[in-house]
Amino acid sequence: MFLAKSIVCLALLAVANAQFDTNYASGRSGMVHLFEWKWDDIAAECENFLGPNGYAGVQVSPVNENAVKDSRPWWERYQPISYKLETRSGNEEQFASMVKRCNAVGVRTYVDVVFNHMAADGGTYGTGGSTASPSSKSYPGVPYSSLDFNPTCAISNYNDANEVRNCELVGLRDLNQGNSYVQDKVVEFLDHLIDLGVAGFRVDAAKHMWPADLAVIYGRLKNLNTDHGFASGSKAYIVQEVIDMGGEAISKSEYTGLGAITEFRHSDSIGKVFRGKDQLQYLTNWGTAWGFAASDRSLVFVDNHDNQRGHGAGGADVLTYKVPKQYKMASAFMLAHPFGTPRVMSSFSFTDTDQGPPTTDGHNIASPIFNSDNSCSGGWVCEHRWRQIYNMVAFRNTVGSDEIQNWWDNGSNQISFSRGSRGFVAFNNDNYDLNSSLQTGLPAGTYCDVISGSKSGSSCTGKTVTVGSDGRASINIGSSEDDGVLAIHVNAKL
């Protein structure tokens, strides 16, 4: 037993040194989740917007064949029928082309992969034409049989780790990742995506799988494909969906030796702060002091595709596109702060939490419509195209690894800080104006506020801020303004 445990620990250590590198192209940071977009549309977005605006990566919806469900809800993508690359987003040829085109403009691809389970009862027909019999645990498209699954049981007690990992999540047939054949099939699937040029994976429902089994799977994966610009010996970036708000049997610390985790406490906490339930002044120690995993183990976000719908963690405290002023402020803070690896959500609008993406006919996904101001229509929200968000991606790229300096707060809901001498940001979440002379840390000069506008040649389409020889500037953010944040950086100097 001791030897077995030692082998598992060594496997964890071997994986640990490789899976935390995002594999971003130099000078870029931040990824965006283009939720339910088609592959052809993502390829064009990489070339036309993500690449030119400094985004480092794109998380895409599950790429493999899923069950076709009545009314085509978004969650059908999380009910696998096979590992064939055939979904409403496109086929394998389109996906491969997308990855190649995105890599060519410096935007890496991260695939949402689902291998905790297969489709639940009722999922008998797939998007690639495969059939299945979930009631008998038969999925010929892989193929999987009943021998490859855990015994049928429901998860009802999250204080029982065995039940959480060995029973079925909402009726989804629970694969046994300790089974060598299942491991072979999962590794084959992930390696195929690596061959096509992806940079990493978001592992769905990782909390419901045993860490030792995941260590074996991750440890068997190929190195990234150098034909797509990755350095020799690079490993896939692994981010695991582990919802840990405390008080349950399973902890995120069981997974942080394997890769990064989705830090849901970040989403919950940032929502509370910018909704006014906590004061901005307390953000001075934002990070592990708030119960988050280590920075290089934390994928951070304001909201994700689950909790913006009330699923997962956070509940009513989660900020979404439906509360735009505070959402933009929270997103700007996330991108201005050095903690974690930030992911921007890009949604489609919804009124029903089961509602799928916009379609042309009830089945085929519609392409987003782009407006002259960069925003989207046609049912797509495209938060990643909001100026207050994409300009903060450029801010993050500009400040690099510079530390937070010159922290200021008013003892309430007005704060500011610099990132070294390269960027400065201020926030006002009070119900009265912010009008203060603040230390920006920046060289003297006139700067364009990249929240209210953008630098255009030698002019600015928004507010300007004049920094004196002492680094101080008069900062003004009215409580009734559309944006409760102001940001300047050295690349926005006029």
From Swiss-Prot:
Binding note for cofactor: Binds 1 Ca(2+) ion per subunit. Binds 1 Cl(-) ion per subunit.
Residues with the modification Pyrrolidone carboxylic acid, per the entry, are Q19
Q: Which residues form the signal peptide?
A: 1-18
* Site annotation Transition state stabilizer: residues: D306
Give the consequence of mutating S71R.
In strain: KN-3, KN-9, KN-10 and L16
For this UniProt record, give its keywords in alphabetical order, as a comma-separated list: Calcium, Carbohydrate metabolism, Chloride, Disulfide bond, Glycosidase, Hydrolase, Metal-binding, Pyrrolidone carboxylic acid, Signal
Q: What is the effect of changing S156R?
A: In strain: 1420#1, KN-3, KN-9, KN-10, KO140, L16 and TN256
Q: Where does chloride bind?
A: R202, N304, R343
- Disulfide bonds, paired cysteine numbers: C46-C102, C153-C167, C376-C382, C448-C460
Task: Provide the Gene Ontology terms for cellular component.
Answer: extracellular region; extracellular space
Gene3D superfamilies on file: Glycosidases, Golgi alpha-mannosidase II
Which Enzyme Commission number(s) are listed?
Answer: 3.2.1.1
Effect in UniProt of substituting V465I? In strain: 1420#1
Q: What is the effect of changing S401L?
A: In strain: Berkeley
Q: What is the effect of changing Y144H?
A: In strain: Canton-S
Q: Which cofactor does it need?
A: Ca(2+); chloride
The record's listing under InterPro entries reads:
A-amylase/branching_C, A-amylase_C, Alpha_amylase, Glyco_hydro_13_cat_dom, Glyco_hydro_b, Glycoside_hydrolase_SF
Annotated positions binding Ca(2+): N116, R165, D174, H208
* GO biological process terms, semicolon-separated: carbohydrate catabolic process; carbohydrate metabolic process
Q: Altering A231S: what's the impact?
A: In strain: JP-70, KN-17 and KN-21
Please give the SMART domains that the UniProt record associates with this protein.
Answer: Aamy (SM00642), Aamy_C (SM00632)
Self-association and partners: Monomer.
Which family is this sequence assigned to?
A: Belongs to the glycosyl hydrolase 13 family.
Q: Which PANTHER family match?
A: ALPHA-AMYLASE (PTHR43447)
- Descriptive protein name: Alpha-amylase A
